[in-house]
Amino acid sequence: MPICEFSATSKSRKIDVHAHVLPKNIPDFQEKFGYPGFVRLDHKEDGTTHMVKDGKLFRVVEPNCFDTETRIADMNRANVNVQCLSTVPVMFSYWAKPADTEIVARFVNDDLLAECQKFPDRLVPLGTLPMNDVQRAVEIFGKRIFFFEIWSPAKKSPEEVKRCVSMGIKGFEVGSHVAEKSLDHRDFWPLYKLTESFKLSTIMPGFCEFFENWGLTTKTPGICEELSVVLFVHPWDMHMWDGRLDKYWMPWLVGMPSETAQAICSVLMGNILVLFPKLKLCFAHGGGAYPQIRGRVSHGWNVRPDLCAGKCKVAPNKLDGLLWTDSLVHDPKALELLINTVGKEHIVLGTDYPFPLGELEVGRVVEEYKPFSAKDREDLLWKNAVKMLDIDENLLFNKDF
């Protein structure tokens, strides 16, 4: 019997932006790199598969997590036209050596692209990046040579930077943090937008200032804004809080919403959406706990600006309308709060397929939300995703149910 079964609530068009996938055959990275912490798959005779980490069972998954034909059958049964596929966060491997994380990321992305090409009108890939070394992350798109981009008329072609996107990747899933670094950390700025040529300013202090004084730029086009690439932020590596989350499935029920709220607050109060207003950040699980604590965060920003408003002079509640989230909140009242936080124009359907904590009746909360008009439902079920991902809807929806 399946761990969980996804079903349909209607025949409405649907684009699910939050669906996970694993490669069917994962190399033994522990053996390859010579240290533990990596996941491998152990396929069992009963049809289940064990995700194994350091010799211990991490999670049981079924073929719909790695077999594309099984996935498509589930999508047909649940009347899902399109899924946006992203890896399971345990595959991020941000804790590993950066060169090794890059190898894992490239393997995951190559497998993801290959599987999506089997059903290009049904599956949209969202890749992964070695976020523990953002320079490597940028080079996943294509190498950029910061030094020559300052003055060379024959600077590197943007087409090379667009290599990965031209292969079909519409965005990247990133973790809610990387070790001690939240998403406002300056190390991530090269991935966000027009950022200072940090390589030069680090190697040769004052060099960039010298050129800028002469009216020459040391700024490089930012990858994600330039290419209209979405960063899908997923909570991961939830802290165990001295063991208090060890039982009752607390890391997933409490840890994940808290982790996502912390990531959103870092982005808002870290000035990221002021510096990079075109950046598309979509947060999983309806933004986690952020809609519930939004008023508290804004109040704290007002009464303790010395602690909260150091980098950003714009109140958080004036910026959260720039955020995107998925719709995975499980409750109509929670959806209403989310709408009042980010706006119904910035919410996209998400299920967390194929895991049991997802929305098993796909689109149920959206379709049963009584204040919605037919247009509102259509927007949340698929049209907002088309806008966020910047995809041609004419290339999709070749499957009628």
Curated annotation (Swiss-Prot):
Q: Name one Pfam family in it.
A: Amidohydro_2
The entry's keywords: Decarboxylase, Lyase, Metal-binding, Zinc
Q: Does the keyword Nucleotidyltransferase apply?
A: no
Q: Which domain of life is it from?
A: Eukaryota
Q: Which residues bind substrate?
A: R59
- What EC number(s) would the UniProt record show? 4.1.1.45
Q: Name the residues that bind Zn(2+).
A: H18, H20, H234, D352
Any single GO molecular-function term of the entry would be: aminocarboxymuconate-semialdehyde decarboxylase activity
What InterPro entries does this protein's entry cite?
A: ACMSD (IPR032465), Amidohydro-rel (IPR006680), Metal_Hydrolase (IPR032466)
GO BP term (any one): negative regulation of quinolinate biosynthetic process
UniProt entry tagged with the keyword Lyase:
yes
Q: What is the reaction catalyzed?
A: 2-amino-3-carboxymuconate 6-semialdehyde + H(+) = 2-aminomuconate 6-semialdehyde + CO2
- Biological pathway: Secondary metabolite metabolism; quinolate metabolism
* Membrane-traversing stretches: none
- Which cellular component, as a GO term, is one annotated location? cytosol
Q: What functional role does this protein have?
A: Converts alpha-amino-beta-carboxymuconate-epsilon-semialdehyde (ACMS) to alpha-aminomuconate semialdehyde (AMS).
> In which family does this protein belong, per the annotation?
Belongs to the metallo-dependent hydrolases superfamily. ACMSD family.
Subunit (UniProt): Monomer.
What is the protein name for this chain?
Answer: 2-amino-3-carboxymuconate-6-semialdehyde decarboxylase
- The organism named in the record is Caenorhabditis elegans
Gene that encodes it: acsd-1
